[in-house]
Amino acid sequence: MQRAVLIRDYVIDHLGEAFSKGYIQVYYQPVIRSISKTLCGLEALARWIDPVYGFLKPNEFIPALENTRQLYQLDLYILEEVCKRLRACLDDGIPVVPISINLSRMDFLTCDIFTEVERRTQKYRIPHHLLCIEITESMFVQNAREIRIILDHFREVGYQVWMDDFGSGYSSLNALKDYHFDELKIDMDFLSNFTQRSKDIIQSTIHMSKKIGIRTLAEGVETEEQFRFLRDIGCEKIQGYFFGKPLPFDEMKAHILLQHIDVETEELTAYYEKAGDMDFTTDESLAIVETMEDGKLYFRFASPAYQDVLASVGAPTPRDSEARLNMPESPIRKKIARLLSHVYDSDQPYAITYTIDDQYLWLKVQKIAQLGKRFLLRCKLLNITRNAIQIEQMKVNGLEKDLYDLYHAIVINDLDRGTCQPVVFCRDYHKFHPGHTYCYQTTMRAFGYLSIQKEDRPRYERFMDADTISDRLSAHGGTLSEYFRTLTPNGFVWCQHVFIAIPDTNCRIFLHTVKPAIPNNLAMEKGLVKLYNEIKKDW
């Protein structure tokens, strides 16, 4: 207790001396982008290294300065040093990333903080996007209206405003409701015991933030397990001892080099932020893949469902799939390269079907972002063969309800031979049996007569027209989709009919899948009828 009192009195009386003699130093802690492990930011933190008392912890000097209304002097000193550092780096051609500084409630009450910040950024010619303002929810206990006006002013001229320690207090959600923030810094005390409940809270926070357009950063990350969890739920940025503790600038720089962490440029930041806009919390098959200048592919994210498909064809992890895809003579690589040549030149998704170990896989890819010859891609992968096997097993087990949640039919069609071969038929047709080959035209007409509602048959016949299918598939990247009311054990319901071209066949061989589209209710039917009346104008 006596030491604490002595330090408090010492700090109050020696602040000016600490500034002039360099006892107070700025330490920088790296902020890492989760999907790329690139350096995307730094936080500036005050450290007091005293000749009398040694290394003072922040909680040994900040409360004393706050109680004596001197804290604004410390914050402005840190701001000045950060601006000096940024200007020196810019002048020397050293890559820079945005640096965040902490402002306290006292800064807003004891000085014109906006003018003070502007004065220094103008003095050192610092672009506003390189400086981020961190505040805590305690800022809004009093004078909330005046503080909000100042924060809005910061944002209007290009500074980012972040909420620090989100979740550590009791009014975080109220602050989010009433104020505009560019980023949330999530307090990792949530994960101190790493229970499922704490994970669920973090995941919900990430999902909410993406929905309202706020970026996320988790601070206090210390383990590989925490990092992987946060990356996989879509938390964009990571800060903590796992990637590096706060250090003087030159030591921090050396640490980053030693860890082989690349520094983001402004262009790279904008590029990766396109992926950060996506919601990773999905049960669907989803992957984010990056293709580099040398043509190699790297998984930046893969959902459990996507990894499950990879494992079904002998790639237990995304890294194993990378190795297969990046082999120069890999036939799969060549097929996917042809697909990507279309994806790179368009904002539309493209899809192919290919085989691995006698299993049909369907891959859909869409461009998210481009930086020169680097691309971020959104991918969806399905194992059609395995799904078909699951369907057949469900039939054996009598699981009709689950069965109809998957596929009504899967058929392989060969236009050159004029044949079709059912892989799956969920209903029992005495004329069509999986594993047998039939005439395409005869089957198409019979299926239309038996299974398509009368009013939809003209559209169905145009959709199934063998003379135009190849051209239509080619024009739409290898996939076509349409909706028809199709007969099921529950009567006629809206089903999605999809054509998927088999690669290297000039769209002459394709899969035809049929699956229920939406719940069969009157309101939705009326909506679809209206939609189709509009679509008919383009036929």
Sequence positions of predicted segments:
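Active-site core of bacterial EAL-family cyclic-dinucleotide phosphodiesterase domains
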Residues: 3-64, 102, 163, 218, ...
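Sensory-domain boundary/capping and coupling elements
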Residues: 171, 387-399, 521-539
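Short loop/turn elements at sensory-signaling interfaces that couple input to output
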Residues: 39, 50, 246, 361-380, ...
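The catalytic core of metal-dependent phosphodiesterases that act on cyclic dinucleotides
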Residues: 118-193, 208, 212-245, 531-533
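PAS-family sensory domains
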Residues: 291-346, 420-478
